[in-house]
UniProtKB/Swiss-Prot annotation:
The basal body constitutes a major portion of the flagellar organelle and consists of four rings (L,P,S, and M) mounted on a central rod. The gene is flgH. A lipid is attached at residue 22 (N-palmitoyl cysteine). Belongs to the FlgH family. GO terms for biological process: bacterial-type flagellum-dependent cell motility. It comes from Syntrophus aciditrophicus (strain SB). It is found in: Cell outer membrane; Bacterial flagellum basal body. This is Flagellar L-ring protein.
Amino acid sequence: MNILIQNRLIFLFLILWLWTGCATKPDFTAGEQPLDLTVRPEALPVRGSIWPGESASNMLFADKKARYINDIVTILINEASQGGNKATTNTSRDSDSAAGIDAFWGLDQSILSRNVNMGSKIKIGGSSSSTLKGTGNTTRGGQLKGTVTARVVRVLDNGNLVIEGRRQLTINEEDQYLIISGIIRPEDITTENCIFSQYIADARIVYAGKGIINDKMRPGWATRIVDWVWPF
């Protein structure tokens, strides 16, 4: 019987091992996607006019801020977040009850008189108490600083700019990606053509990577299988 159970366990682990071997590891390919190099179509000059149309290069009093598609702007990333939650529960309950019965299904009262400790009536009593105390506390924080140059990919009807920027860094076969996208207002751009990440609406900031270091941060497949199967 023990040999049969042992063989079943070996067969089960063999199936799990083959199943994990067939699984493919998802790769982080967000930084490898080709850039959208959409060029804004140039406005054709009006017949009989030499004005080529509005652009950043022919404005007499315009600065070099990003305004049009494919213009670039530098994003100063300085993100910090911190949150906490605390809960405390304290409950208590006590109850007592007592009852006396003169007659109980024709029980002979002489039985009570024979024992002085029982008294003259049938008595029923009980008490209960319960106490519950619980405390929970969680804290989480994160911080990200960096600089990345983004490109204007769309100009909205109200003049706001949709931007997208990516940076890929490879060191010793370890790839790191920094991706940022969102919507900015031209008036929030400084004279140095920079903008802080706090001024980006619908901001999406991704900082991730893949490589040996990233793989070592994850538990092995056997540990993950045991954690998934283990019910306790």
